[in-house]
């Protein structure tokens, strides 16, 4: 296991240890470098960076996809950022939404109601509703950033929404958000 600041073994060494070609190692290192997990230092080698300070949001998604737990502090901070962004998304959607944006949200709310009535979780509808709000902002950057949060927490939301009460509570919040956006309030 490597820690921040550690020098990685040579490409040849890594290839031998992992039973792959050097080309495969080079490709993997390029991906890790683009995600800011490692840095190449000329005439020195490849070093592990402090990912808590320098990694890209892509790494957060990868970490979630691989089922690697973040720290409680990481999770709290991610939810804090998501909450800030979603509040701003609702404000922008109130000003910029179109009738077709409202129709999309209305359809998602109806689908979620149907899922709840059947005792099914609404994790997909939850994501779709929030992404419909993001689309209504007409801000492509905000939409992409919010997408990262939904990718990060996809598996957690499946568990969260397996509880019918949570689904109902979430649906109630969604209705209030929809009404505020509809009223431009």
Residue ranges and their predicted role:
Residues 10-11, 138-140, 184-185:
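Short loop-to-helix capping motifs
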Residues 78-159, 169-180:
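Conserved amphipathic alpha-helical segments that form helical-bundle/coiled-coil interaction surfaces
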Residues 162-165:
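Structural signature of alpha-solenoid helical repeat scaffolds
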Residues 1-84, 91:
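Short linear motifs at protein or domain termini
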């Amino acid at each position: 296991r490597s820690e921040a600041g550690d020098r990685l073994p040579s490409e040849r060494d890594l290839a031998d240890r992992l039973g792959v070609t050097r080309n495969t190692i080079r490709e993997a290192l390029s991906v890790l470098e683009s995600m800011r997990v490692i840095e190449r230092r000329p005439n020195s080698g490849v070093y592990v960076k402090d990912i808590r300070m320098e990694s890209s949001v892509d790494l957060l998604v990868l970490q979630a996809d691989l089922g690697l737990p973040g720290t409680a502090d990481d999770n709290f901070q991610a939810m804090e950022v998501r909450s800030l962004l979603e509040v701003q998304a609702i404000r922008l959607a109130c000003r910029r939404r179109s009738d077709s944006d409202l129709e999309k949200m209305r359809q998602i709310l109806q689908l979620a109601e149907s899922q709840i009535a059947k005792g099914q979780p609404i994790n997909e509808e939850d994501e779709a509703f929030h992404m419909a709000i993001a689309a209504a902002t007409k801000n492509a950057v905000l939409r992409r950033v919010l997408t990262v949060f939904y990718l990060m927490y996809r598996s957690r939301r499946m568990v969260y929404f397996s509880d019918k009460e949570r689904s109902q509570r979430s649906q109630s919040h969604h209705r209030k958000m929809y009404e505020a956006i509809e009223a431009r309030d």
